[in-house]
A protein has these predicted regions:
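Active-site glycine- and acidic-residue-rich loops that bind
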Residues: 108-109, 124-129, 155-168, 208
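Hydrophobic faces of well-ordered beta-strands that scaffold small-molecule active sites
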Residues: 19-21, 66-68, 98-102, 110, ...
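Conserved strand-turn element in the central/C-terminal portion of the radical SAM core barrel
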Residues: 107, 115-119, 139-163, 182-189, ...
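Canonical Radical SAM [4Fe-4S] cluster-binding loop centered on the CxxxCxxC motif
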Residues: 5-50
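Auxiliary Fe-S-binding modules of radical SAM enzymes
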Residues: 1-15, 169-273
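Alpha-helix-loop-beta-strand connector modules within alpha/beta enzyme cores
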Residues: 83-100, 129-148, 174, 201-224
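Conserved, mostly hydrophobic/aromatic
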Residues: 27, 35, 51, 70, ...
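Conserved SAM/AdoMet-binding glycine-rich loop
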Residues: 59-141
Length: 273
């Protein structure tokens, strides 16, 4: 039994075994020029009656459900009262439920993308390095476990130095619990808009330049407490992972070897390029 989802539907890898309920559709911002996830949808908050009916139906077929993920990208855009209503009903209908999550919840992703204001402006992220640090600081004070995502190559060749230097600085100030580094890949449907909003020629990085950025990020990211670091997304040239600062030297040694042996890199067709 599967719900009649409004596709496309996304969830983090960690939610592969979770039951998914779409309490919102699309993204309320939906202006990041590099992102195509919800461009085919207009943001909407689903009616409680529809969500309730789906919970009722799935609780009959899967009463032992232990994990639930609330989609789409902006479940937390619901009002507090709406969220409480959904959560209370989920725990009522699924007596073995242990965890309910959504994008921007603890241990899920917060897309920083870059710490450089110029890059953030050019990709219409709607944030600055300072505002990102402030938002993350508020979340940390309230007990959130922060998992932050950045995008290698987002500054192109022109802004590669500033992109990585400022991203490492922001990450060091934020002190997240997890960091995921992806590599820029534009869906063909996003290419023209990305280039137009960038407002100047954009040169994509080659694989060696992406490794250079990853190397500089690991070198300059100076967390005060241990941070789980992952560059193992499908878009990455190779899976590099560890805990900073303890595994810094090991990860840098791996990157050095990859530069010497480019044949070890993941073929582009396996990265969706």
């Amino acid at each position: 039994m599967e719900l009649a989802y409004d596709y496309p539907l996304y969830r983090p890898p960690s939610e592969a075994n979770s039951m998914i309920f779409q309490v919102t559709l699309g993204c309320s911002f939906n202006k990041c020029s590099f992102c195509d996830m919800y461009r085919t949808k207009e943001y909407a908050e689903r009616q409680w009656e529809e969500v309730k009916a789906e919970i009722d139906m799935m609780s009959k077929f899967y009463p032992d459900t232990q994990r639930v993920f609330l989609a789409d990208g902006d479940a937390l855009n619901l009002s507090k009262d709406q969220l409480v209503q959904v959560l209370q009903y989920l725990y009522q209908k699924f007596p073995r439920l242990e965890r309910v999550s959504c994008y921007a919840m603890p241990k899920n992703l917060l897309g920083i993308e870059s710490g450089n204001d110029t890059v953030l402006r050019k990709v219409t992220k709607g944030a600055t390095g300072k505002s990102i640090v402030q938002a993350c600081s508020r979340a940390k004070k309230r007990g959130y476990v922060l998992s932050c995502m950045i995008i290698l190559g987002l500054g192109g060749r022109k802004y590669t130095e500033e992109h990585i230097a400022d991203t490492a600085k922001v990450l060091s100030e934020v002190a997240p619990d997890y960091v995921g580094a992806l590599t820029l890949h534009l869906d063909p449907s996003r290419h023209d808009e990305f280039m137009t909003k960038y407002a100047e020629p954009f040169e994509f990085l080659d694989d060696m330049e992406v490794l250079d950025e990853l190397e500089r990020l690991i070198q300059n990211f100076d967390p005060k407490t241990p941070v789980v670091f992952r560059a193992n997304h499908a878009s990455n040239v190779y899976s590099v992972k560890g805990t900073l600062p303890d595994d810094r030297d090991r990860m840098l040694a791996l990157i050095k070897d990859l530069k010497k042996h480019p044949e070890m890199l993941k073929p582009k067709f396996l990265r969706g390029f």
